[in-house]
Amino acid sequence: MKNIKITQIKSAIGRLPKHKKTLIGLGLRYIGHTVIREDTPSIQGMVKKISYILKIQEE
């Protein structure tokens, strides 16, 4: 499977609790934090839900 590089570009302060939990589920903790995840349907759904907070790059 392909991997995607996910970077948090906005703060989690003031976001919906579901969106904060989604960030934690992806393993993101702070602005500028980058993680590499497999490009699975579940990860794609999480990314789509909070795309306004993230920057996505394919590897």
From Swiss-Prot:
Keyword line: Ribonucleoprotein, Ribosomal protein
CDD domains in the cross-refs: Ribosomal_L30
Q: Which domain of life is it from?
A: Bacteria
Recorded GO cellular component terms are: cytosolic large ribosomal subunit
Asked if Ribonucleoprotein is a keyword of the record, the answer is yes
Q: Does the keyword Ribonucleoprotein apply?
A: yes
Mind listing the GO molecular function terms for this protein?
A: structural constituent of ribosome
Q: Which GO terms describe its biological process?
A: translation
Q: Which family does it belong to?
A: Belongs to the universal ribosomal protein uL30 family.
Quaternary structure? Answer: Part of the 50S ribosomal subunit.
User: Which named protein is this?
Assistant: Large ribosomal subunit protein uL30
The species this protein belongs to is: Buchnera aphidicola subsp. Acyrthosiphon pisum (strain APS)
What gene does the UniProt entry assign to this protein? rpmD
